[in-house]
Every structure is written in structure tokens, then in C-alpha cells.
Amino acid sequence: ERKQIGPMETLEFRQAMAGAKHPWRFTAQNMSDGTLRALGVLTALFQRNPDHAPTLIGIEEPETALHPAASRALREALNRAAKHTQIIVTSHSPDLMDDPDLDADTVRAVIAEGSETHIAPLDSGSQDAMKQHLFSAGELLRLNQLAPDPENILDQQRQVSLFGEIEP
């Protein structure tokens, strides 16, 4: 619930407590960072204004400050929202990626080489392991085996310049 405090507004959270006649009330400043971040992520994912709904939502490390046990609920929310809009998520969290139904074709791996960063689809070994349900993306990440496809990286290095010339 929105609550007016002088010229400013905050959110007021209510929590039903066993044995209490009325719910406990907390303002946003008394809530954990993880709770507030989760609320922000859920708000971004489930906006339903048909005139202004986003076609793309980017979320960087949505699991930050979130209890690891909440990763599954966050994954489910991301999957539900992805049915209505394109969502790009960056994460270092194996817990968030521990979904056996995560499609290997939707995962991208990042590698830093020198002063360059490359983003590419997974290499064939990682894709096969996921498609055969031998490992989840999270398990591969824990084992340091989630790798980008080297052929795709080579293709990226042969980019067309601004004026149409192919660079080596």
C-alpha cells in the first residue's frame, strides 16, 4: 500500500502474524534489500498496461540480496513473464540457472579475453549436456563448464565495419 509521509510517499507492507489481531506493518525503509529488489523485479515483469507495456525487459543479477531458496520462485516469475515479453537476464548465480527445463538455445555464455568480452551461444558440449538433461546450466556453471561456442566467437571477430568493409 502507498503511504504518504509528509511531501513524500513510501510503501507500507503488512504481514499477518499468528496470534496477532492485526497484521504487522512495515515501511519500505524497514524491509530487506532483497525484498525491495524482488518487488522491483516483479513490478517490471508483470506491468500490464496494454498501451505502455514494454517489449523488452533487461534485468541484471535479479538474485542479488535474495535468499537462495527464493531462486526457484524468481525463475518461475521470469518464465511466466517471458510468455508476454522478451526478457534478458544476466546472472552469476548457479541457483538461478538450476532449471532442468531451461532451453540451452536461450542461454548465452560470456568470456573475457584480454580487453575484449565475447557473448555467444553455448558450445556444443554444454548444449548437449543440457539437452540430454545430464546437467542443468547451473550445474555446468558450478563446474566451470558453461562455455561459449568458439566458432561463434570467430564469426564475431569478422565484423563488417561502418562502411561495409570486412575486418580481418
Give the ranges of each region predicted by the language model.
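Loop/turn-to-beta-strand initiation segments
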Residues: A53-T55, H67, A82-I88
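A generic structural signal for well-ordered coil/turn residues at beta-strand boundaries
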Residues: P7-E9, T35, D103
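Extended helical coiled-coil dimerization/tether regions that scaffold
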Residues: E1-N30, E151, E165-I166
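GG-anchored amphipathic helix commonly corresponding to the ABC/SMC/Rad50 NBD signature/C-loop
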Residues: Q15-K21, T27-I59, A69-A73
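ABC ATPase nucleotide-binding domain "signature" loop
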Residues: E61-L66, L96
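C-terminal lobe/lid and adjacent interdomain/linker elements of RecA-like ASCE P-loop ATPase modules
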Residues: A73-P168
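Active-site flanking residues adjacent to catalytic metal/cofactor-binding acidic residues
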Residues: I59-E60, S91
